[in-house]
Amino acid sequence: MLFFDAYTLEGNFRVFTIEKERFFMTKSQKTTHHLTVAALLSAVAAVLQFVEFSIPVMPAFIKLDVSDLPALLGTFSLGPVYGVAIQLVKNLLHLPFGSSAGVGELSNFLLGAVFAFIAGLIYQRHKSRAGALWGSLAGAATMALISLPINYFIVYPAYVVLYGLPLEGIVGMYEAILGAVAHVPTQNALLNCLLVFNVPFTLCKGLLDVALCFLIYKPLSPLLHK
């Protein structure tokens, strides 16, 4: 009886050990896969950041790109923390090639991180197509709203200091497109420009990323979740 109990105990211990090793091996493989996918998405995002287009209704220094798309793919497939990490790595890779002394990269990271984190956080709690849609829409809307204080308090003041650009000259670029838009709806010229141009532009940029994400996510899903 004692021999049987000892034999059974030894067998159970072996099973436990095997299952434990299998668990840690699976977890390690999963982490490795996540890091690999995140690295690839970061590289793609960095490349996309160089592919930018001018928009006729925006000042020439504001460009459109879809470099937030890989972070959106990452936040849905890997989690919100990975989405933020992809945004960080993307901008670090772009930093040596940028011409804004890091201001543009900082702004891009802050806005993109908010976008990816909120989208991923909502999807994490509501894992469905509807959850992904509402999460990404909420992320895009929040990014657009946050762009107002970031541009007003950080980006444009930094450009004035770093490049010696008069604020009136920056506002003039906006006015040249839509007349005296800088005089409505508030008495603050720069604030008006950001409200009329930058916030809607940032929202549309986010919505474009959302549309592209929903278009390509399913075909890429086997690679993202392999």
Residues covered by each model-derived region:
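Loop-helix junctions at membrane interfaces
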Residues: L2-K226
